[in-house]
Curated annotation (Swiss-Prot):
It is found in: Cytoplasm. This is Probable ATP-dependent RNA helicase spindle-E. Belongs to the DEAD box helicase family. DEAH subfamily. Keywords: ATP-binding, Cytoplasm, Developmental protein, Differentiation, Helicase, Hydrolase, Meiosis, Nucleotide-binding, Oogenesis, RNA-mediated gene silencing, Spermatogenesis. Residues 339-526 form the Helicase C-terminal domain. PANTHER family: ATP-DEPENDENT RNA HELICASE (PTHR18934), ATP-DEPENDENT RNA HELICASE TDRD9 (PTHR18934:SF113). The keyword Cytoplasm applies. Its main location: cytoplasm. The gene is spn-E. PROSITE patterns: HELICASE_ATP_BIND_1 (PS51192), HELICASE_CTER (PS51194), TUDOR (PS50304). Its EC number is 3.6.4.13. It is an enzyme of class 3 (hydrolase). One of its GO terms (cellular component) is nucleus. It catalyses: ATP + H2O = ADP + phosphate + H(+). It comes from Drosophila sechellia.
Length: 1434
């Protein structure tokens, strides 16, 4: 055979391409050609700033001046900013008395005079009476939140005037606890005079309430709905400094309504760290400037502050300074912090000598709190402290981490005292600024840094940016010390930089986070366009951000593209979807999930997932960079093989809910949460939000309906539908799991692991052949103990001359411990995921070996193997390939029986040629003299032992797998019948010890069956999950097996498993299963196709060979099929192993990457969040060359903008064309693009569409592109249009109508139709097509001759109908060329020589060698393409 061909199949040799590829090609991978396209570059859009604000604000100021100067009610209600002066409801100006009310309740007028706010009581009340707006600036603890509202209420009581006060709080817990505290102080019954409202949690009646504490969002929604402030006499906005979007929008609404119809309502703004001047200017008029009242309370203990330049050379060297203006912590900064800890310790030791307190006592109250910007910096700081203090044994520290995702146990460690003699060092993010207070902190080391979430409104990508904290933040941090004694604060910046260059306050949310909810509130407020409303913000956003937000809302269906039928880039009419989104306390895409959940009758699942996505920290983090506990794998357990973080959230919550419903106590719940590494606190928050969302949905008319049991979805259909609505909710956050379509890709995978099964194999590197690896297999197996993979579940092998160590995990359901099973999707075993996670956690792993120079003497002395000519040969078991039951290389069809069926992917076949042998053995085994060795003692049975075991009525050869785990009854054992393949659980009475003579005669006889699987098919994701075969498919195979003798065609033999086709009376079962949609067609993997090609050519040449030649060729073939064995030798004793070798790995050849399909992300590198179930992204179906779609809940961008991180990911079903179908289904509009000849559709472009006159895209950043690899036909577009019509019809309402027009019965009918059509769409067996690329992929095309589609809902459609260009007939000349190309390829298939560079024109595939060509001809893509051009190989 030609040497080039032999080299191609020799995995020990690198594959070198012969130079001389045709000019103009980058590679044979069309994806790589696509990267050169300039059309993927996002066109630069001009950034428009805040110039638009000036004119709008000036008009608003005039209105405010006019209203507060002299109120003149108008009779007409206008809706434009230019004319709006009043509301329909005239403001009450009469003084309303409430004497009867005050008689009902006890009013104690004695207030706490010890609070510092009390000294300002009269000043505050006088200011409220004199001004419409006042500002109170009071430190935390001064009493302003509880006392100021009471002062107002007391004054109203004295005068008998009606009073209704509302006080906002940014957090639910604060509103509840403060209201309860006031009730307790005043001795009022809860929910009478004083009450609270958070979300929808409120008293049944607020009739008696005169002091209401509520969240900011509650008041904001009330004011938007009522469009007046007059329901209250006083509005107190507390913690106004936080500047979240709700607060900023509330300020807009308050000022707007104050300027229109509510001038007599008093506004009180309060905060500890407030920019008083900014707020004063915001509410100032020509006649009134809001007064600022400041109150402070003195501290009991002093605080000293030190800055970086004041510490000087004590902790910093001159050369360590660096650029102090760059927000970062370099290695010198970490070291400086450690030096400060040492200085603190030395200082306290000296002070202890001079004081009465001992050093150990000072340690109890001398905790050090170090503020760091994130978890990465926390881990780095911990490593530096541990490393640098190892040399100073006198200082003992307890390092405690403090961040939002930590476990409750770790949270408690923050407050617990340290062990005697230890100093507690708390490494915290900004959560420790205000959320927690640790009394024993006496020292703060503040790097003055924080991480701020910023979202690019054009791309929707968010990023955590490391930036300088504001002075307000730093003051909050400094306030953490001095609780029990004097404290010190060390700021790691220069004093001048702190005072002159650091900002006083942080960046408001409205300038850095998405504006969707604010714009929706502006639309519901209906007092002007979003631009006109947001221009009135305290910090107005850029006009570009408003425009981008409008585009995003149009994309999610919250706004129509037009205003009164005319396109407007800065506005759009509100849809009913938008109304729902505005009323749900969620991100718009989470609200869209609920809307789609309602449409598909999966509302409960959608609500739970949306609530989980809105709550941080569900899966608890243990802390520490190097910990690889069970916490990560709990994601996989709860995801249950779905490949979805969102499904994991749903299943965690259902489990928690079942615990609540059966009445588990708190301790049991804590133990459960600890075991599964979930946060009970987060689950309780999710539970509250789920309950709130249910009520809100009910108020909106979103109520699930019941269906007949026969119409209910089974678990599999529900899983598919859930993923469909996830894809719809989070469009266009789409990624494809990239598949390199280069012809050598499959070969390279197997070459990397020397022909092992990539779905079960990982490998280490850096282990030289001279180390004699076979002697250390047990040591290598021990490395996997950290991920709890038992040694008996793996084989360790080596490749001659290679530095790789291969670890192959065994595929045996009977051996695996189900308690350690981690469900994953696809063919890859869970152990591979665990192994790769080991490497990601720590790359290098040491192993101790003997000095290679002493190795030979060691094995010779102990007689381990043989040493031949200075080369060690490990001991091996003899193998007589003639006795193997495996099909010969010359066998195409074989008759026999299927003896055992596990599934269509694993069954055992007993050739008819062995019938006589089996009969003779059975007769011998069941002779009475052979069955006398009863098993009387369970200890006599050992794992792997050969015994005689009862199968049906006869005893047969069997191997003991393992004993049953249960110990509460008589011993039982799992056994495998060697000559039949099936397993059974048997008692000792059903087993016999095999006599010695039988063991000698039959102990080494290989099984008389061989394992099989169906060839060229794989389980369908539409009928079964986790790569499992459906019950219906397995039953069909069992039915065929029961018919007796059958014929199979052997496609290939790999890893001693035969891929076969099974003949039935009316065809082949493989094809029948595809026809019945119980499975789908699939390519065979590389090794299978390689073996098939080899077998075909050997069978074609068989007639030219003698019997002896055929026997010799078959023996060589059988030996080549056997992989290296695991020798499992006892390693040398530890005292002889002094040399350390650093293994690197484990690696998997299936590790792959993702590609973002949106235009703005297509050129960026993509990672998956390290806490996701898809963080370890492997090609779970390596034989499948389709791109798999992954949908992300959120996309983050790194600091330099080059890398994206997908969060909350879901791996979509492995359905042909699924990604393209989802784009067509859920994009606002799309175009199916044709190839150059116009004969087939080759790509899908989705997005908001383009300007019909200029062809410029409305939202180019979010245009998505998928190149098709399967046929999409006109029928598919018709089905998709039907689905879009039904989705639209659920919420369609006529203009000026508030509620949808669809009835309850119609909704059930719509749901039934949706299910049916989606199943039809996804179950289609689609033909493969070649990849086509174009430099105009992202360009929207115009087809003036194409008639517009029929629009049932006109311009009020959220999902308008897609139009379709008509395909052309294939040109006859082109068909001739393609057929001639095919004919030439088939002729070259039989050539033994060098192939000139050739291209398969059908598949757009470059071919470099004859072996490559042969295997390409066996792919489904090529075979489908041949059918499409009616080519028949003669």
């Amino acid at each position: 055979m030609d040497q080039e061909v032999m080299d191609f199949f020799d995995f020990s040799k690198e594959l070198n391409r012969v130079p001389g590829a045709p000019q103009g090609y980058i590679s044979s991978d069309p994806w790589l050609m696509a990267t050169e396209s300039k059309s993927s570059e996002v066109p630069n859009r001009e950034t428009i700033g805040t110039d638009y604000v000036t004119k709008i604000v000036a008009k608003e100021k005039c209105r405010l001046n006019r209203t507060l100067l002299e109120y003149q009610p108008q009779g007409k209600r206008n809706r434009t900013l230019d004319d709006l002066d009043t509301d329909d409801e005239a403001e009450e100006t009469e003084i309303r008395r409430d004497d009867e009310y005050y008689k009902k309740f006890r009013f104690n007028l004695n207030r706490d005079k010890n609070l510092s706010i009390y000294a300002k009581r009269e000043e505050i009340l006088a200011a409220i009476n004199a001004h419409p707006v006042i500002i109170i600036k009071g430190e935390t603890g001064c009493g302003k939140t509880t006392q100021v509202p009471q002062y107002i209420l007391d004054e109203a009581y004295k005068s008998g005037k009606y009073c209704n006060i509302v006080v906002t709080q940014p957090r639910r817990i604060a509103a509840i606890s403060i209201a309860n505290r006031v009730c307790q102080e005043r001795e009022w019954q809860q929910n009478t005079v004083c009450s609270f409202q958070v979300g929808l949690h409120r008293p049944n009646s607020l009739e008696d309430t005169r002091l209401l504490y509520c969240t900011t969002g509650v008041l904001l929604n009330n004011l938007i709905n009522n469009k007046t402030l007059t329901h209250y006499t006083h509005i107190v906005l507390d913690e106004v400094h936080e500047r979240d979007q709700n607060m900023d929008f509330l300020l807009i609404v308050v000022r707007r309504l104050l300027a229109t119809n509510s001038r007599h309502v008093k506004i009180i703004l309060m905060s500890a760290t407030i920019d008083a001047k900014e707020l004063s200017d915001y509410f100032a008029t020509t006649n009134s400037i809001p007064p600022v009242i400041t109150t402070n309370h003195g501290r009991k203990h002093s605080i000293e502050k030190f800055y970086r330049d004041q510490l000087g050379s004590i902790i910093w060297n001159e050369e360590d300074v660096g650029d102090q203006h760059v927000p970062e912590i370099n290695k010198h900064g970490y070291r400086a912090a450690v030096k400060i800890i040492v200085i603190i310790d030395n200082m306290e030791r000296k002070a202890a000598i001079q004081s009465r307190l001992s050093y150990d006592e000072t340690l109890r109250y001398g905790a050090v709190l170090i503020f760091l910007p994130g978890i990465y910096e926390i881990d780095t700081m911990a490593e530096n402290i541990t490393c640098m203090l190892e040399n100073d044994r006198n200082i003992k520290v307890l390092i405690v981490r403090c961040f939002s995702l930590m476990t409750p146990e770790n949270q408690r460690d923050v407050f617990n005292p340290p062990p005697p003699g230890f100093r507690k060092i708390i490494l915290a993010t900004n959560i420790a600024e205000s959320s927690i207070t640790v009394p024993d902190v006496s020292y703060v080391i503040d790097f003055c840094l924080t991480k701020v979430k910023v979202t690019d409104t054009a791309s929707s990508f968010s990023s955590l940016r490391l930036t300088w904290a504001s002075k307000a933040n730093c003051r909050q941090r400094a306030g953490r010390v001095g609780r029990l004694r004097s404290g010190r604060v060390y700021r790691m910046v220069n004093k001048h930089f702190y005072q002159r260059e650091m900002a006083e306050f942080g960046i408001p949310e409205m300038l850095r986070l998405p504006l969707q909810n604010s714009v929706l509130k502006a639309k519901v407020l209906n007092m002007g366009s979003p631009m006109e409303i947001l221009a009135l913000a305290l910090s107005p956003p850029n006009l570009s951000d408003i425009q981008n937000t409008i585009l995003l809302l149009k994309e999610v269906g919250a706004l129509y593209l037009t205003v009164d039928g005319v396109y407007d880039a800065l506005d759009g009419d509100l849809t009913y979807w938008g109304t729902i989104m505005a009323r749900l306390p969620l991100d718009t895409r989470q609200s869209r999930l609920i809307i789609l959940g309602y449409i598909f009758n999966m509302l409960e699942e959608a609500i739970i997932i949306a609530a989980g996505l809105s709550t941080n920290g569900l899966f608890a983090h243990d802390g520490g960079r190097t910990q690889l506990g069970d916490s990560f794998w709990m994601h996989y357990i709860f995801a249950d093989g779905s490949g979805s973080d969102l499904v994991a959230i749903w299943r965690v919550y259902l489990t928690y809910l079942s615990l609540v419903e059966i009445g588990h106590d708190q301790e049991s719940a804590i133990r459960w949460a600890k075991r599964f590494h979930v946060s009970l606190r987060s689950l309780k928050e999710i539970h509250l939000l789920v309950q709130e969302l249910r009520v809100r949905c009910m108020h909106l008319g979103l109520i699930p309906f019941s269906v007949n049991p026969s119409q209910m979805m089974d678990d599999r259909e529900k899983a598919i539908m859930l993923k469909v609505i996830i894809a719809g909710a989070f469009y266009p956050n789409y990624f494809t799991r990239s598949k390199d379509t280069c012809a050598d890709t499959d070969r390279n995978i197997y070459q990397t692991i020397s022909g092992h099964d990539p779905c079960r194999t990982v490998y280490f590197t850096n282990f030289k052949p001279a180390y004699m690896g076979e002697l250390y297999t047990r040591r290598i197996k021990e490395l996997f103990q950290e991920v709890r993979i038992p040694p008996e579940n793996m084989d360790v092998t080596f490749q001659e001359g290679s530095q790789k160590v291969f670890v192959t995990f065994k595929q045996d359901d009977w051996i695996a411990d189900s308690s350690k099973f981690v469900p994953v999707s696809g063919r890859v075993q869970s152990e591979v995921y665990k192994a790769v996670m080991m490497r990601q956690n720590r790359l290098e792993r040491p192993i101790h070996i003997m000095n290679p120079s002493a190795f030979m003497s060691y094995v010779q002395q102990r007689g381990i193997g043989d040493v031949i000519e200075g080369r060690w040969i490990p001991p091996t078991k003899p193998l007589n390939v003639e006795l193997l039951a495996l099909p010969s290389v010359f066998d195409k069809t074989i008759s026999g029986l299927i003896t055992c069926i596990v599934s269509c992917g694993k069954f055992f076949f007993q050739p008819q040629s062995f019938a006589e042998c089996i009969g003779n053995m059975s007769e011998i085994f069941n002779a009475p003299q052979q069955l006398r060795n009863y098993v009387n003692n369970a200890g006599d049975i050992t794992k792997g032992m050969m015994v005689l075991a009862k199968r049906d009525s006869y005893f047969q050869r069997a191997t003991v797998i393992r004993p049953e785990n249960q110990s509460n009854r008589q011993p039982m054992f799992y056994v495998r019948f060697i000559d039949y393949g099936d397993c059974a659980l048997l008692s000792m009475q059903q087993m016999r010890l095999m006599p010695r003579e039988l063991t000698e005669q039959y102990g080494d006889l290989p099984p008389r069956v061989f394992e099989c699987r169906l060839a060229m098919v794989q389980p369908s994701s539409m009928v079964s999950g986790n790569n499992r075969w459906s019950t219906a498919a397995n039953d069909m195979l069992r039915s065929v097996a029961k018919s007796g003798l059958i014929d199979i065609e052997v496609y290939s033999l790999f890893n001693n498993v035969a891929a076969v086709l099974i003949y039935m009376r009316d065809g082949i079962i493989n094809d029948k299963l595809v026809e019945l949609m119980l499975c789908r067609r699939s390519d065979e993997d590389y090794m299978s196709r390689k073996d098939h090609d080899f077998r075909l050519r050997r069978q074609e040449s068989a007639r030219y060979l003698s019997s002896a030649q055929r026997q010799q060729i078959n023996e060589e073939y059988m030996r080549s099929c056997q992989l290296p064995e695991d020798h499992d030798l006892r390693p040398p004793p530890p005292e002889k192993c002094k040399t350390v070798v650093i293994l690197k790995g484990p690696y998997s050849p299936l590790e792959c990457t993702m590609q973002c399909i949106t235009r703005v992300g297509s050129s960026k590198r993509v990672n998956i969040d390290h806490l996701s179930v898809n963080a370890l992204l492997l090609d779970a179906d390596p034989q499948d060359h389709h791109d798999h779609l992954i949908v992300a809940h959120e996309i983050a961008e790194n600091r330099n903008g080059h890398t994206l991180t997908a969060r909350g990911t879901t791996l979509m079903p492995n359905v042909q064309g699924f990604g393209a179908l989802m784009v067509m289904l859920f994009s606002p509009t799309m175009q199916l693009k044709c190839n150059r000849e116009g004969t087939s559709y080759v790509s899908v472009l989705g997005g908001l569409g383009c300007d019909p006159e200029t062809n410029e895209p409305y939202f180019p950043e979010h245009d998505v592109l998928i190149n098709l690899d399967v046929n999409i036909l006109e029928d598919d577009v018709i089905l998709i249009n039907q689905i879009r019509y039904y989705i639209d019809s659920v919420f369609f309402n006529f203009k000026d109508e508030n509620n949808p027009a669809v009835s309850a019965n119609e909704r059930v009918s719509i749901y039934t139709q949706l299910r049916s059509i989606i199943n039809r769409l996804l179950c289609k067996d689609r033909r493969y097509i070649e990849r086509n690329m174009s430099n105009a992929d992202f360009e929207w095309e115009t087809h003036p001759d194409l008639p517009p589609p029929n629009e049932p809902f006109g311009k009020r459609a959220i999902f308008p109908m897609h139009s379709l260009t008509e395909l052309q007939e294939e040109d006859t000349g082109r068909l001739v060329q393609l057929r001639e190309n095919c004919s030439m390829l088939h002729k070259w298939r039989n050539v033994e020589g060098t192939l000139p560079h050739m291209t398969c024109k059908l598949c757009n595939q470059l071919l470099d060698s004859v072996p490559q060509l042969r295997l390409h001809l066996l792919t489904i893509l090529h075979r489908d393409r041949e059918k499409q051009i009616d080519y028949c190989n003669q």
